[in-house]
A protein has these predicted regions:
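A cross-family glycoside hydrolase active-site/sugar-binding cleft signature
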Residues: 18-20, 45, 74-76, 106-109, ...
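Glycine/proline-rich, positively charged
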Residues: 82-151
């Protein structure tokens, strides 16, 4: 498996399994199969409504001998929760659904509304612990520069 080193020093597999448009009832089986054939990066999102299935599959994999540290789990904050306080609540809700002690990467799904507030929330989560790296998907270059300055 090849990895990409993130700015915080953590390593992320360059190939992952995403569960976009995977029915919630099928997510657990699909992710179990993906982990079984060697995928270690699993990508979900609040808006996919299948975080619980992903979490159940991770628990099954760990019970079967896969170490949590081998897995790289990412989820995304949906646009309805892009503000500092709502992002913190949404993170807690995602963690509860996933049933994980920590998350490897938390993405702002799309940069609408209070992106800077959501970024501040992610910085707070990182400082609090839990191993959260943060990033923004689908983001214009100018906003990336501004967020880089805020870090």
């Amino acid at each position: 498996m090849q990895y990409l080193t993130l700015n915080d020093g953590n390593k992320m597999p360059i190939l992952g399994y995403g569960v976009y448009q995977v029915e919630p009832a099928e997510a657990q089986r699909c992710v179990e199969d993906a982990i079984g054939v060697g995928y270690r990066l699993i990508d979900t999102a609040q808006a996919y409504y299948n975080e619980e299935g992903v979490g159940a599959a991770v628990k099954t994999a760990i019970a079967g001998g896969v170490k949590r540290e081998e897995l790289f789990i990412t989820t995304k904050l949906w646009i309805s929760d892009v503000s500092e306080e709502r992002a913190l609540k949404a993170f807690d809700a995602s963690m509860k659904k996933l049933g994980l002690d920590y998350l490897d990467l938390y993405l702002i799904h799309q940069p609408y509304s209070d992106t800077y507030g959501a970024w501040r929330a992610m910085s707070r989560l990182k400082k609090k612990g839990g191993g959260v790296a943060s990033a923004v998907s689908a983001l214009a270059t100018l906003m990336r520069v501004k967020l880089w300055i805020l870090r």
